[in-house]
């Protein structure tokens, strides 16, 4: 008996849920071989990649998921989170702004906005009164 894509996706999600990463990867890969732009399989492959420390490799999966279905809030959040993890804060902010422009909203989106604001605040240069003593020490050798 051949499984439908939804059944294979369910099996992948279940394998992922119980920590069988290789099995989940196998199911998601099977879906993507049949339907390369499948939004859920792409998103879940991105989540798998992040979970094993391959965040850079997750980006194309998240982007494909978004292109296939930009109405799913979690797709946006996962993509933005991956960009933040990679230190690409400006890209994360740009994607967030794009999401807002498409009408994406909700509590999790508001929380992401707060997170991005905090990251931006932490990037600012320190006040000159804090910098001057360090500069003085540096110039003194």
What is the predicted role of each segment?
Residues 17-18, 51-52, 85, 118-119, ...:
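Register position in tetratricopeptide repeats
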Residues 44, 78, 112-115:
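Canonical tetratricopeptide repeat
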